[in-house]
Amino acid sequence: MKIITVTNQKGGTGKTSTTNALMAGLNKKGYKVLAVDLDPQCNLSFILKAQGNKPTALGILTGEANIKDAIQTSDIGDFIASSKQLSNADKLLDTVGREYKLKKALDAVKADYDFILIDTPPALSILTINALTACNSVIIPAVADIFSLQGVERLAETIEPIKEYTNSSIYIEGILLTKYTGDRTNLNKSVRDKAKMTAEKLNTKLFNTVIREAVAVKEAQAMLSNIFDYAPKAQVTSDYENFINELLEAE
């Protein structure tokens, strides 16, 4: 089984959209998937129609809840909902070994799944550190602009001490360009070339697949759905299908 953290320290790069599409696409291929929402914005939890009476990721991290009690079900797989109180996680998690809280909790259920996907906040915090400590690999969504790629480079600086101190086996699956409008402009082509160079510096790759800009992604979220069910014939759905196939082929 594989635990994948989807992260970028820059906001607006499509982390939640990518996690949701991965969850749906892998589920449709017959894989058993668990998603963990660690973002205090709770967007993934909202899309998955989380129940408010169940324990959340916060309870898992503080030890106040059993992970099996926190697992909810959706049409595209199981998930653990976020909590807005996770914004205080750096203060709430103040015990020795706080970096390992999520890893320890997932150890109790990981045998039940083929993939566990972790959606993270757009910031370096104890939440992101827990996600990186618990996972096998990392997918970095990035939009085609220079600031997003700077976020990728900052993330790489975070992963190095994680690899040294809390998770020696972690590796970066690759950088995924999202909200892409094509190579028609010199700027987009330049940013794509920069993304390739950034990937090489991180000893990883730029995925061959790019996720194009499409209103269907936001529409699917507004309908509390996923791109595969909402717009199965859309070009962006084909993009996500190709991305998932590329990811699985690298296994």
How would you label these PLM feature ranges?
Residues 1-251:
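P-loop NTP-binding core
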